[in-house]
Amino acid sequence: MIQVLLVTICLVVFPYQGSSIILESGKVNDYEVVYPQKIPVLPKSKIQRREQKMYEDTMKYEFKVNGEPVVLHLERNKELFSKDYTETHYSPDGREITTSPPVEDHCYYHGYIQSDIDSTAILNACNGLKGYFRHHGEAYHIEPLKFSDSEAHAVYKYENIEKEDETPKICGVKHSTWESDEPIEKISQKKDFLEEKKYLELYIVADYVMFRKYGRNVTTIRMRVFDMVNYITVVYKALNIHVALIGFEIWSLKDKFVINASTKNNLLHFSIWRSTVLRKRNDNAQLLTGVDLNGYTLGSAYLKAMCDVLQSVGIVQDYSKSPYLVGAAMAHEIGHNLGMEHDTKTCSCMRGNCIMSPEEEGSDFPMEFSSCSLYDFQNYMLTDTPQCLINKPSNTSIIKNAVCGNYVEEEGEECDCGSPEQCENNCCEAATCKLKPGAKCAKGACCKKCQFKKAGAECRAARNECDLPEFCIGQSAECPMDRFHKNGHSCQNDQGYCFRGYCPTLAKQCITLWGSDAKVAPDECFQNNTNGNEYDYCKKTNNVIIPCKPTDVKCGRLYCTGGTENPSEGEKISSDPCKASYSEIEDIGMVDHRTKCGEKMVCSDGKCIPL
């Protein structure tokens, strides 16, 4: 009996290669036990003199995979957080509690495998090594074996994780036919903008379901979010975009609005919350939800909306145990904000899956953007030039020591155009990162030939009749913050009212859904919305259908006439002159928020209310 017991204990403590095991990522059907050995990076004398930190800036580990030695080089991601990073949660009595925790000495790393030029590593060293690395074209996970007192780790291929759900997850963003109508000569003047280093200050919110899902443990959720952002920073480096987490918020008491299965409604309400309630300045905000979204949808975002006061947002479902898969979904939605459409069959990536694939593909983590995505991104940058991306964060809030010559304008620098051999900026002294004598600026929408443009020079044209142009002030290289007409300003020949820089109208929505020849249907068609059936209603809450009141009928299902035979989204459910669209997966075909529904009246949450 004693002999049997000893054998059992040995099997538990020292798992063998090829067995199944339950790990944090799920059930793994084939894995290998490794014992990472730390290799000193600096000579002992330097290690002793070095400032004492809990986590080192650079580390090196060696272990074997399939009998082959692997040397893992790691460097701490010093650009993960902004200097003014904050965290917010809520007390039981409803008080908002915001702190500025120390995050400089964190445990999140990027790296590579020695002698493997195409390798990548994204992991944390908070308690052992945990994360993802790519070696010889294969995707691997590594994580500590919790039930072992030794340094044992499990290494396994991503493909060997037993899938939680075999059904492919899809993105809720629909294809658009947007094309630039700017003249080539005007676009060519914006090439400098495309080449500039860009900063994306990201704010992430975890909803109340997330809080409950992870046992109300704030530390567990924040570590998961940090893993996601660590992944996102890697993939966006390829676009010369530095992503820094500027704030993280947990709705630990209750959600700030009703979050349900409809990504369209959630996205709208989150965008309104961000623009009217959230006080922390940010370039983009993402809502991480534990709610199961409609159908197989894993997220959604507004297309070409980066820096927009209202629409620079996305929503992502926490659909997988792997933080990197959820991080990939968030990187995908941010890509939509940056103008990228879904990849088609003609798009491809050199290393496996592409980030902008319309559905999650289970064979590997996406690590790069396709040529199609790069084309979309470049077009969007050249036509829309989202200014928040080149606004240097306050105090260059990236946590790292300034390095002259890295193209990043950091604290203490007036400019940074690369090394003296690489610099092509006539206003910047490359060796010192200072402006040349007589120069007042080196770049910016209000900088020309090293001088500030005169006050009154237009630096950002109005996008539409609800937007306002911006003009240089004569004392700065930066274009002033984007402004627009006040809400309620009449637009589109009195067909609508401006709302945060946009003019939502029934006519425009019909054209989007049914093509350029479509028009708004006769008023009697909208009376169907009083029926309160599967298709005709004003609001659906938790699958409960609420019919429209007679005064609210133009705030329910959208009815159009003419145009194409089938809609661009959803399925046709009725014919001319009362054409409508419907989809079970998404709440498609409903009248948009703030659309005009009467004189001085607009739609809001399925009701026609006064401005």
Swiss-Prot record:
Superkingdom per UniProt: Eukaryota
Cofactor stoichiometry and binding remark: Binds 1 zinc ion per subunit.
Disulfide bonds: C307-C388, C347-C372, C349-C354, C404-C433, C415-C428, C417-C423, C427-C450, C441-C447, C446-C472, C459-C479, C466-C498, C491-C503, C510-C560, C525-C578, C538-C548, C555-C603, C597-C608
Catalytic residues in the record: E333
Range of residues in the leader sequence: 1-20
Keywords: Cell adhesion impairing toxin, Disulfide bond, Fibrinogenolytic toxin, Glycoprotein, Hemorrhagic toxin, Hemostasis impairing toxin, Hydrolase, Metal-binding, Metalloprotease, Platelet aggregation inhibiting toxin, Protease, Secreted, Signal, Toxin, Zinc, Zymogen
Tissue distribution of the protein: Expressed by the venom gland.
SUPFAM superfamilies per UniProt: Blood coagulation inhibitor (disintegrin), Metalloproteases ('zincins'), catalytic domain
Disintegrin domain boundaries: 401-487
Mechanisms controlling activity: Inhibited by EDTA, but not by PMSF.
EC class (word): hydrolase
EC id: 3.4.24.-
A single GO molecular function term of this UniProt record: toxin activity
Similarity annotation: Belongs to the venom metalloproteinase (M12B) family. P-III subfamily. P-IIIa sub-subfamily.
Other known facts: Negative results: does not affect beta- (FGB) and gamma-chain (FGG) of fibrinogen. Does not interfere with ristocetin-, thrombin-, and collagen-induced platelet aggregation.
Assembly information from the UniProt record: Monomer.
Main function: Snake venom zinc metalloproteinase that has hemorrhagic activity. Inhibits ADP-, TMVA- and stejnulxin-induced platelet aggregation in a dose-dependent manner (on washed platelet, but not on platelet rich plasm). Also specifically degrades alpha-chain of fibrinogen (FGA).
Protein name in UniProt: Zinc metalloproteinase-disintegrin-like ohanin
Organism: Ophiophagus hannah
